[in-house]
Amino acid sequence: MRTFRNCSHPLLAAAMLFASMAAFAAELPLGPMPISLKYLPVPPVPGLADGSDPIVVNKPAAIALGKALFWDSNVGSDGMACASCHFQAGADGRSKNQISAGGQSKPVAEQIFADSSDATPLGPNRTLSLADFPLHQRLDPLADSAVVFDTDNVVGSAGTFAGEFKGVNRFTSGTDICNRAADPVFRVGANGTRRVTPRNAPTVINAVFNHRSFWDGRANNVFNGSSPWGDRDPDAGVWVKTGPRNVQKQRLHLINSSLASLAVAPPANHTEMSCSNRSLLDVGRKLLYRAPLQNQLVHHADSVLGPYSNSNPEKLNPGLNLPYGSLVRQAFNAKYWSYSGSVPLAVPAGQAPYTQLEANFPMFFALAIQLYESTLISDQAPFDNSARDANHQPVDLSAAELNGLKQFRKNQCALCHLGPNFSSASIAANAAIAQSHPEAFGEPTFRISASSNVVNRIPLLVGGLPVTAFYDTGFSSNGASREANDIGAGSVDDFGNPLSFSLQYLQLLAGNSAAVQDSEVNAVRACDFQDAVATNLKLPYSLPNLFTQIDGLMPQPQSTANCFLPLVNAFLPTPAAAAAELNKAVNRKMVAAVTATFKTPSLRNIELTGPYMHNGSMATLEQVVEFYSRGGNFKNDSKHVTRVFPQPTLQTDAQNRADLVAFLKTLTDDRVRYQRAPFDHPELKIPHGHSGDEVATVAGNPLNASLSKDEYLRLSAVGAEGAAEPLPAFEQRLAP
């Protein structure tokens, strides 16, 4: 629902919002007009490949390294590549053995596989069918009607068998030495199956625009060289050669690098890719001395890897023509790999000390993958390529698609799926074009704040009370699942600190600056909130949702240039006023709505990236539109009820719903659909369930006799010109 920039009284604004929610039949103003992705700048990473002493000295070599690492099944302990969960338009389109028993926040004791809506086992090794979706079903899918089926099970991504890591082979075997056995949760009878993640795998295409990565934002905007946690990790750093006989561990601080922060996590995760207790240093020891993609065909016309391939027009061959270590040396500054001695790091018993090349492998791996993924920008969809009229309408779309765009703007979709990437999580990129393309963020009478603020404020209902709550920019709760199943950005990092920027910001306002873990929280400007936190108007009374002079105010410490709100709102509560409000039994001014909030995904290529939502609970775009038409599934406290509520123009008009889906399909880039450069790739053999079904599997996996035999989905090597056949949508991959 809308907030109005010219309305300085928060109670009036809230009244307008909640009244208009009730008046469903009323005509709503249109939201922001999306624009082409061609206008969106990639957020810069100072110091990565620029300046007098860059980290990357050969960017094309680094991109080649990143692409090889992303697609190489030797990265995993038992055949999982990064691409194994991101092969279908950057997402995961598998349909067998994709079910996890409960969300990310479910205790192990409560992780129980349910039955499907037809009472058959919805568990390990099931082949999903269209009838299994959605995972929450209503008697009338367009209305807040009786629930006829619900499960907390998640459609995630099948990964590894796990097991206790023991060692690697440096040259030949792609599987690690691990003590493996049947998993206590992921099994069919006595036979172990591959584990499945408790969240759906989002696309990596256009992910370079995200300020943070992962659904919960735990992949920090700052890359520290060795972990996902940015400046939060006190032990992070990289090894730098400072002299012929000296190497020193130094801190690294690369902004706009959440893709690098993300990249270091899956290869060490014992559900996604790894045996337990394996580090990225072990992965480096395994890979650096062998050829990239040594068991996978590489197309001679691959847009990146072609010059390094062993293939020719007559025959495709596996691997590249140089080892990983050589690519690293070509791509990265010598001070990160040229030290000839060992680094002072603890090593497992009986193993040789780590070289500098091995010790810095997490940095090489992460930055190379980030640079590769930064090339995966799909800005040539029909929506992008259309001419525009004076009102910025894409005139080359059909009448149905244009009506779908109107429905997209009218039914609150554009408030979260904002800007050229259709995501408010693209913070820096959206802020960079807010002045040059204001139409992307609303009309003069109603506009969405598109600043560099990582915290924002909107009216919500929390605990039944109307409040103006803080939330993390680019994160929201739409009520897709119960709050207890997965608390999303309301969780904490490995050190016990909140992931949420909003929770840190509350502590900052209350005078506890030591609680701030992420430096961008200190830069949040009060005058750039969607709805104000304070007003400096001389009012003779206090307000329930807004700090006033009576409470105690101080000017915001940052500049007031180009503020979104009037300058009377460029104020903050004093620390004493903020702390007093936090300590109240009923707090309405210092509320953070972050529990069960998740990163707003891009809608680009959305027809190819199902299943949908963080829990993979919907198979088709039609099911997604039904979900939003009825206003979601659950009424969580952090739910954005002023944006997700029943939409009468969709509930009552099947043509509007069909047209909205038609518009969403104009966001598909045919280069993605046909796997053309830069979306071409090597061959990949992807684990896709096991021999048998959800009732019985065939044991005798070569890794361990107690494990089920793998089945595979084989992806052929594709060159720059792409494939002859288009990628199918997720529902087309499902069983009848």
Can you name each region flagged by the protein language model?
Residues 3, 24-736:
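Periplasmic c-type cytochrome electron-transfer domains
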Residues 20-21:
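N-terminal signal peptide c-region/cleavage motif recognized by signal peptidases
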Residues 2-12:
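Bacterial N-terminal signal peptides that target proteins for export
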